[in-house]
Amino acid sequence: MQIPLSDIWRQFRGEQDELYAAILFQIRIPRTFAAILLGGALALSGYLLQTFFHNPIAGPFVLGISSGAKLFVAVVMIVFLRYSRTLSSVDLIVAAFAGSMLSMFCVLLMSPRVQNMSFLVLIGVMIGYICSAVTDFLVTFAEDSDIVNLHNWSMGSFSGITWENVKTIVFVVAVTGILTFFLSKPMEAYQLGETYAKNMGVNIKMFRVLLVILSSILSAVVTAFAGPVSFVGIAVPQMVKRLFRTAKPIIMIPACFLGGAVSVSYTHLRAHETLA
């Protein structure tokens, strides 16, 4: 249902129509806020992974992190719905984080045996396909009601977002984003090489662990509430880097978040206009 701009302005001036007010304040605005926050989180997650692997095609979807999160959320949804239990925002985030960490752990487990980082990305792609295959298998044998919920969620949509979800998203993204910003100086040193970073006093092992955890949390919160969303984590950091002509993390971190927020929210609004 399309709402004219004049009617939207009237809602904010206090001349409220009950139907328009319900649609605007309970459906449209929460989804738009979620698109902004989750888009920024996804782009930031991609930037962290590209920094970690020194590879421009690394991202949460390519490395199988989103697929691992999708698998665990699918399992939790099937189990909870089968026993008529209500899924909370925390349940979704914990399940998605566990899945994303497991996928990332599998990739890192192979890293000591692999010399080429590009091959490590291919391992992530393989893990992603395995997780997707297992998810499809579970959906095939799930009950009809479970399939409907899983299908709607797995398409990558903001349609189920509520104000309670937005509160959780704001908290998780804000905390993770602030922690990421504090890593800007170690990230800049790490971009110049591990030897240089060590000489600058960076604890490489701890730094890598923090990158993995932060990128997994950001990817998990996106997958938990919007389903698996691809390409944003890969494309936006590269677009931002070329736009600002810099690779400095202190600029790239907020710029990637802003770029992801703009691209996803714009896509969400355009898709809604097309399908409305």
Regions of interest found by a model, annotated:
Residues M1-A276:
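Alpha-helical transmembrane segments in inner-membrane proteins
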